[in-house]
Every structure is written in structure tokens, then in C-alpha cells.
Amino acid sequence: MDHLPMPKFGPLAGLRVVFSGIEIAGPFAGQMFAEWGAEVIWIENVAWADTIRVQPNYPQLSRRNLHALSLNIFKDEGREAFLKLMETTDIFIEASKGPAFARRGITDEVLWQHNPKLVIAHLSGFGQYGTEEYTNLPAYNTIAQAFSGYLIQNGDVDQPMPAFPYTADYFSGLTATTAALAALHKARETGKGESIDIAMYEVMLRMGQYFMMDYFNGGEMCPRMSKGKDPYYAGCGLYKCADGYIVMELVGITQIEECFKDIGLAHLLGTPEIPEGTQLIHRIECPYGPLVEEKLDAWLAAHTIAEVKERFAELNIACAKVLTVPELESNPQYVARESITQWQTMDGRTCKGPNIMPKFKNNPGQIWRGMPSHGMDTAAILKNIGYSENDIQELVSKGLAKVED
């Protein structure tokens, strides 16, 4: 198979990934592959572009390194072209409502007829099967959080709140990426492809496991946090200093001992309530939990963030300033690791945003291209799979494909 023109880089060089989906979850999976060196083809509707394009800046991050194909994959010759593309594809990712592809005639079995080794990842809110009440429903970030038990655990004591920005989309996208790579490993070993059913609510159910396990195995439900503090443990969470906010985790025997000396509670060490070897202070079960919070709040409020960071570093207490977005790119750690970078958009502008992560030492990822325009690579992709200029123009004339204007 000849690949589309692009530099060779990263651990996934030579891999062809195709995705069909809008907004965040499914495309995020595809973009991870693209930043790690895979050739990634983004399928968009012919009549209207991905709704993410209406955003002024985010698409330049979320659709960089992609090849844009505008094709009606469910109708006539457009479907034929899509199935032809599948013959040279390693991984196909689709994000839709339940078994939408199967309902429109593109089943796993049809895809495997054209490519027995194909890895197929289906990403939806409620999965490919289940009850009719849920399976075919639309879902976004907040829907998956609400249905999974994740949302009810977040927020403040007075009200649950979803975790933003779009947590369920990103977790689900990364799940699709990792699951597809696991399936690809097996497919290359056996010659037999795989179909993966990723339900966003199940992803969030798994991510929300920490406290839910206590309920499933004893009926205890963790309360929501208060003012950003850990619902269980004193000295953990968000705290106010004299000049701003920090987060901290008071965990460990020596950390508690030394911190208690600083905040005036050394006399509690070795008591029945806080015996020697205590590694965490339970804010509910320990009768001194509220007192620890009171003393810690007072001590932190009397010190600047810089003073707290310096002292906590000496005590090996995990702590960080809550950075504002304007502070990020000048932070020395960000600068040293080039966590924020710049790249050129297709119209020649400079765009700034997060760099590629994680950092591969021997086969690093790279940004080689900005977000392509709607249908920008349609002709090149169709030529790559054997279509002539006349074939492409016929698809365009029938409204089954769109090429760049």
C-alpha cells in the first residue's frame, strides 16, 4: 500500500487509521494516532462539515495532522469507495448512536469481507446493544457522566456538578485508542480482526470506581467534597494561602508528623485517635479531623504560596499552586519541556496550544500539518485507492463526494 504524502515519524509510522465522527470523543482517538505518526483519514459529511469547525481555535488543535475526506459512505458509489478504502485500513473508528452503521448496512461482517484483519472500534453513549430505551440515544460528555454515577460524585455538598471540560469525551477517546492498539496487536498475530464496543457510560463507570466500590461492597456512599477538599481525608484537596490557592496531599507517616509540628498539633501524635504510623487522617472517622482542617487552614492563610511550597518541599508533602491559564506558558517546567508549542495553520496563521504527549524518546511524535479544510484531501485519498480523475468527478457530480474548492 502506498501512503498519502506525509513525513515518516513516531511509533505508529506506516499505520492507516480512518475515523468517522464529530465533535470530540471519536476524533480525539483518531488524533492521538495522528500525533504518534499514523496516517489518519477524517471522514466528514459531504453536505455539512464537522460541527467542531464552528469553534474559533480548538479545531486547530484537535484536527491537526489529519487528512480530510468528504464522502457519503452510506450511499451507492460513495459506499463502494469507503469499502475500497477499508481494504487498506488497519483501524476504523466510528462514533455514532448505538449500532448506527449496522442499521445502514455497514456491519462488522461486511467490513471484514473487505479486510479480514480490520480492527473496528465503535464508540457510542450507551453501547452497540442493550435496551431500546437507551441504545439508540444520543450522548455527549454530560450524558455519559450522569448515567455512569460519575457526575453524582462531583461538585459540592450542595449540588452535583459535571467535570469539565468534556471529561467523558476525552476518557472515551483514549479508551478507543488503547483498545484499538490492543486489538491490532492480536490481529497482526492471528490475521483475524476485532470489533470493539465502547460505551461512554461504561468508561465513566470505570473511571468513577474509587468511591463506588465502597458502595457496591458495603453500601457506603462517599459524600461529595466541600470547597474543593477531599471528602474523606483531612489535608487533601484545595486550600487558600495568603495570595492564592494550592492543592496538597497530606499523605505519609513523616509528612503528617512534621506538618502537625508546624500547625501546632504535635501533641496529638501517638494518641489513640492518631496512633504512631498514621498515614492518612480521616476527616469523618477521626474525631480530630475537623481540628486538623481548622489548624491547617489558619496556617496556610498566614503564608504565601511560595512559602508553603518551600516548606512542603522540605517535608516531602505533595503540593502545587493552582495555576491560571496565563501562567502556564511562562512556568519554568512548561518551558523546559516545551509543553506549549506553535504550528502553522493551513491559511498561514500561527496557532499556539498543547504540544504532543506523551513524549516518545526514540520515536517522537510531531506536528506536521494544521487542520485541513473540508474535503481538502478527498481527491488525493481516492486516487490513492485507485480512482481516476473522471471517477472522482463523477462522485462529486452525484453529490457523493466533495473536493476542496
Curated annotation (Swiss-Prot):
One Pfam family, short name: CoA_transf_3
Active site: D169 (nucleophile)
UniProt catalytic activity: crotonobetainyl-CoA + (R)-carnitine = crotonobetaine + (R)-carnitinyl-CoA; 4-(trimethylamino)butanoyl-CoA + (R)-carnitine = (R)-carnitinyl-CoA + 4-(trimethylamino)butanoate
Domain of life: Bacteria
Annotated InterPro entries: CoA-transferase_III, CoA-Trfase_CaiB, CoA-Trfase_fam_III, CoA-Trfase_III_dom3_sf, CoA-Trfase_III_dom_1_sf
Main location: cytoplasm
Keyword Cytoplasm set for record: yes
Keyword Iron: no
GO cellular component term, pick one: cytoplasm
Pathway assignment: Amine and polyamine metabolism; carnitine metabolism
GO molecular function, one term: L-carnitine CoA-transferase activity
GO biological process, one term: carnitine metabolic process
Known EC number: 2.8.3.21
Keyword vocabulary terms for this entry: Cytoplasm, Transferase
Class of enzymatic activity (EC top level): transferase
Cell location: Cytoplasm
List of residues binding CoA: K97, R104
SUPFAM superfamilies the UniProt entry points to: CoA-transferase family III (CaiB/BaiF)
Assembly information from the UniProt record: Homodimer.
Known role: Catalyzes the reversible transfer of the CoA moiety from gamma-butyrobetainyl-CoA to L-carnitine to generate L-carnitinyl-CoA and gamma-butyrobetaine. Is also able to catalyze the reversible transfer of the CoA moiety from gamma-butyrobetainyl-CoA or L-carnitinyl-CoA to crotonobetaine to generate crotonobetainyl-CoA.
Entries under NCBIfam families matching the protein: PRK03525.1 (NF002914)
Family membership noted in the UniProt record: Belongs to the CoA-transferase III family. CaiB subfamily.
Protein name: L-carnitine CoA-transferase
Organism: Escherichia coli O157:H7
